[in-house]
Design a protein with these regions (language model features):
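Conserved PLP-enzyme active-site core in the AAT-like
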Residues: 1-168, 190, 194
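Conserved C-terminal alpha-helix-loop-beta "cap" of PLP-dependent enzymes
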Residues: 190-274
Length: 277
């Protein structure tokens, strides 16, 4: 029958990987929570393996994961395509499309991070892979009368135009000025929260990807009487609601400038300060 298993490193399981199962595919882990070796991938390939999926976040390197280079080598030696989720890998510009240039058969990029609408993205890959994707799109569903899975996932023409405009803008703007502005706005939050007792704030040292700089917020609950989750809940319940989160296995809230209009970072910082004073 049809191959239906997509291999994914156990270390790389993440919130969005279940989207791969929308077509009826089955995710199969390889490796362990501690590390992934070449042999782990080699021994996991079967007659049912349809692809190997790789989650790429260059700003968070993982020395214990099997590298993309080795993944591509092993998969291609066995005639298996490699899919890369590179949603936020848009800066520096030389990583834009980098993974298909390395030999991956497909990579996706989220266009929202460049200013396009939330529902849009880019699919890069081999001619064969893009042809297959086009058959599953709502255009393929209607135009070619192929009963794929893309009918519910319409992208309007104006959204497509928006993606083109966003990419052109992203490729030509002054990124040094963009980063300097984000760093300065992150600093405003630090200035507001820096004098609050029991609070530790620091600049996130990163310029790669879609969320440069930003602020890492930690609290001493014994001093503030407020936990990180309390902050999340109270910010969400306020007016206007501010959505933050504490990711699993982390002891801080990361506050990013992406998505905030000029001046809104001061609202965020002031609201948090009010909760902690």
């Amino acid at each position: 029958g049809m191959k239906n298993e997509i291999l994914i490193q156990k270390r790389q399981r993440y919130w969005y990987d279940r989207c791969l199962e929308a077509s009826g595919a089955k995710l199969v882990d390889f490796g362990s929570d501690e590390e992934t070796t070449r042999e782990d991938l080699i021994n996991s390939i079967t007659v049912n393996t349809a692809a190997v999926h790789f989650y790429m976040v260059e700003q968070e390197p993982d020395s214990k994961a099997l590298s993309l280079e080795e993944t591509i080598e092993i998969a291609h030696d066995n005639g298996i395509p490699v899919l890369v989720d590179a949603a936020g890998q848009i800066y520096p510009l030389d990583i834009f499309g980098k993974y298909v240039r390395m030999g991956a058969d497909f990579q996706c990029i989220a266009a929202k991070y460049m200013g396009a609408s939330q529902s849009t993205g880019l699919a890069l890959g081999t001619e064969e892979m893009i042809r297959k994707i086009s058959k599953q799109s709502f255009v393929g569903y209607e135009g070619r009368r192929i009963r794929g899975i893309g009918r519910p996932h319409k992208v309007d023409r104006q959204e497509m135009v928006g993606v083109v405009a966003a990419v052109r803008h992203w490729m030509t703007i002054n990124h040094e000025e963009r980063l300097a502005s984000i760093e300065e706005r992150s600093g405003r939050i630090i200035d507001i929260l820096g004098g609050v007792e029991g609070v530790e704030v620091s600049m996130i040292d990163n310029i790669m990807g879609h969320q440069p700089f930003g602020v890492q917020l930690q609290v001493d609950e014994k001093i503030t009487g407020v936990s990180l989750q309390d902050i999340v809940d109270k910010l969400k319940a306020g007016d206007p609601p501010i959505w933050t989160r504490v990711r699993e296995n982390e002891n801080f809230i990361a506050i990013h400038i992406f998505g905030l209009k000029e001046g809104q970072e001061e609202i965020v910082g002031s609201r948090i300060a009010e909760l902690l004073r």
